[in-house]
């Protein structure tokens, strides 16, 4: 027996009703009777629809994967060799798969990675997969940028938040000029 909870009414239904599709028609379809659907009022005119079949659903989202193209994604084990021991400056971008602003600046970062070529190495570090680095460098907002030169953080190089490609270029050029790598 299922219930539909509205702002002031509870209805009990035990009769069979037409089925409801539980996924998009482009994928395999599992059909559930409408009687297995529970609607709960969350706020005025907003409803949360949940299936009470007891089965757990998982969904893979291709948009949640960070694709780096020319930018290498590194972890804690590669940080020392890639960033601290690098002969050239390294711009580290801390990102997360769930971070909207990180996804927003992705094309600009890719373009700048190609543009700077051998003057600058750009790497990404996943926030969720590398908690020790996040704590060590006190990363509180995403995306978060830190420039490293000769194994040390360049003073004043920290920046966080999404910015335009032009502003990113201005930021990087300013940093490279301050460490005499232009």
From Swiss-Prot:
Residue numbers annotated as active site: 99 (nucleophile), 102 (nucleophile)
Chief localisation class: plastid
Site residues (Contributes to redox potential value), renumbered to this chain: 100-101
Residue ranges annotated for the Thioredoxin domain, each copy included: 68-177
GO MF, one example: enzyme activator activity
Cleaved signal peptide residues: none
Keywords carried by this UniProt record: Chloroplast, Disulfide bond, Electron transport, Plastid, Redox-active center, Transit peptide, Transport
CDD domains given in the database record: TRX_family
Subcellular location: Plastid, Chloroplast stroma
SUPFAM superfamilies: Thioredoxin-like
Transit peptide: 1-67
Biological process per Gene Ontology, one example term: positive regulation of catalytic activity
Tissue: Predominantly expressed in leaves.
GO cellular component: a single term: chloroplast
Disulfide bridge positions per record: 99-102
Cited Gene3D superfamilies: Glutaredoxin
Transmembrane stretches, start-end: none
Chain's role: Probable thiol-disulfide oxidoreductase that may participate in various redox reactions.
Family the entry assigns: Belongs to the thioredoxin family.
Protein name: Thioredoxin X, chloroplastic
UniProt source species: Arabidopsis thaliana
